Amino acid sequence: MYAGTDDPWQLSTRWYEQRKYAITLALLPHRRYRHAFEPGCSIGALTELLAQRCDQVTAVDVADAALRTADARLRDAGLRGQVTLERSSLDDAWPPGPFDLLVLSEVAYYLETGTLAAVLRRECRGLRPGATVVAAHWRHAVADYPLTGDEAHAVIAQTPGLTPLGCYRDSDVVIEVFDNGDGQSVAAREEVPGAC
C-alpha cells in the first residue's frame, strides 16, 4: 500500500481528514492528557496533533513504511521525543501504560465483532481511572473490512465500564467519546453554573 506513496489515504492533505481530526480533538473533554495510546497510527498525522495535547503518546501500526513516515513527520515537528512508535496491532497485547487517553481512529473496523469486543474488554480495564476513549470511523461499508464504522462503534459502546460523553455523526464519519469514570460533562467538571 505504501510502495507508491508515503500517504496513500491523503491523511495530510485531504480536507475530510483535517476536519475529522479537528472534530475529534474538539470532542476530547480534557485540555491535556498524560499518556495517550493510538493503535493504527498510520503515518502519524493524528499522532502529531495528539502530541501537542499529551505529555506522552504511544502509537503503533502494523506497517513499517507507515511507522517510518510517522517517525520523520514527528521529527520534523520537533515532537519525536514524546512519542513512542512501535510495530504492533490493535489486537496484540497493548504496551504498558497506564493510558488516560485511548484513540481508536479508523482502526476498529479491521477486527471481527468478537475479537474487537474481547480486546476492548481485556485492555480497557488497564486504562487510568477517568480515562477518555475517543473513536472515529468511516461509516460506509468497505469490502475488505469486517465491520462498518457504525458496527465498530456499537461494539465499543458495549465495552464494560465505558460511559458515553458525546458524539458527532454525519453521512461519512462517526466520532464518539467515552470515559471510564463518572461521565461528567466538561462544563460540570469546570463547575460552570447550571451544569449537571
Where are these regions (language model features)?
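Hydrophobic adenine-recognition pocket in adenosine-nucleotide-binding enzymes
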Residues: 107
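A conserved beta-strand element that flanks and buttresses the S-adenosyl-L-methionine
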Residues: 103
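Class I (Rossmann-like) S-adenosyl-L-methionine-dependent methyltransferase catalytic domain
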Residues: 1-39, 43-97, 111-125, 131-196
